[in-house]
Amino acid sequence: MIDVNNEYTVKIESVSSDGNGICHIDGMAVFVPYTAAGDEVKIKITNVKKRFAEGVLTEIIMPSLDRTTPDCGIFGKCGGCSLRHIKYEKQLEVKRDIINNAMRRIGGFKDFNVSEIIGMENPTRYRNKTIFHADKNSVGFYSAKSHTVVPVTDCAIGAEENAEIINAISEFNMTELFTRKSFSTGDIMVCVKAENTDAKKLTAAVSGACKSVKSIYLNGENIYGSAAITDTLCGIEFRISPESFFQVNPVQTEKLYAKALEFAGLDKTMTVMDIYCGIGTISLCAAKKAKRVIGVEIVERAIDDAKENAKLNGISNAEFYARGAEKIVPYLVKSGEVPDVVILDPPRKGSDEKTLGAILRSKPERIVYVSCNPATLARDARFLSDGGYTVSKAAAVDLFPHTSHVETVVLMSKVSREPSLLQL
């Protein structure tokens, strides 16, 4: 019987969707962080549930051929980079398996296979946004599954300038710091949450330490420089405010959007509906290829940015609605909007049946689903499949090297059968 504190020697069989190694003891699945498929290891059980258990790695007896030495001093301590101990090319295989398993097991697409996964040539320093937390003693990241701060002076996947900013700001009574960097201009935005902090002293410290800082916010108020910075994706300039959703890896985002637009197959006769459009990144890229684009997003500030971004780039064939997709999409369809192509890029929780049902009623020729969560992608793709669409193509783009997260693009094409009453 498996029990807490029991120790075992096991061989890791595979890697789970959250990056933990999987082994089996007496028929029960055991999840062990920071292990790789093929590892022979000693583990200690830390938690036992009805159907699975959790353990920690105590010793590597025989390392897997997939292993590499992590190039990070806080690997295994902070809550990020759960796959940094695995060779990068193997990380891509793990992510392909995660997607395939979700689509087959959850979605019921038995023959599903990701045709390609696009990795990074240089999977380091790729994040344009980094969030740090602080306690009385240090600035850093939360450790896994806790609010304990792991001190950090630098992060190998974040901007190099973060080290200068952390050093300058550590003397202030801060609770949170996040930075944004424009990869096209090099400009940096610094946003600080702090109590009893002198804005002038903070500004002097940060701007003096890092000349690339062009915008500083303190507790939500712009105290230095511009209210936003700009970055360029696919030849389009985007205005980014503190609240804006903007993909964290611009290098790979361009590849992601290129793949989504390839699947969309747009021409200048087509109307596109972009659901969960954020600040209009995909919408404005699509507008260059389509007759008309309709963008939908629940966050009003993001829609303000989307409209501003359209003006900034001289794009007049994109319109935006600030309302929840589950409300505005059914309304637009009922009002007679008939998109040729629907692109949706929902948050991790996926879409919902009201939105998906409205998409089915609009009968677009193609649906391009961009997802950061294979499980909810599989669920929603099954709903759309039952409503008359088939999975035609699928590709993955690695926006998050060294983590278990991955972006997937799926093309669903209309087939002859009509949606069932459940979808309508």
Can you annotate each of these PLM segments?
Residues T58-P70, G76-M174:
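Extended interfacial segments that mediate partner engagement and assembly in macromolecular machines
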Residues M1-P70, I74, S146, K327:
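Terminal RNA-binding accessory module
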Residues V149-K181, T185, K193-Y217:
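Internal alpha/beta scaffold segment
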Residues I2-E7, K11-S17, N196-L424:
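Rossmann-like S-adenosyl-L-methionine
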Residues S115-P123, T179-R180, N219-E221, A396-L399:
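Short, solvent-exposed loop/turn elements at beta->coil junctions and helix N-caps
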Residues I43, M174-T179, S392-A396:
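A short linear hydrophobic-aromatic micro-motif
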Residues D26, K49, A134-S138, A144-S146, ...:
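Short acidic-glycine loop/turn motifs at beta-strand connectors
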Residues N128, I188, T269-M270:
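Nucleotide donor/acceptor-binding cores
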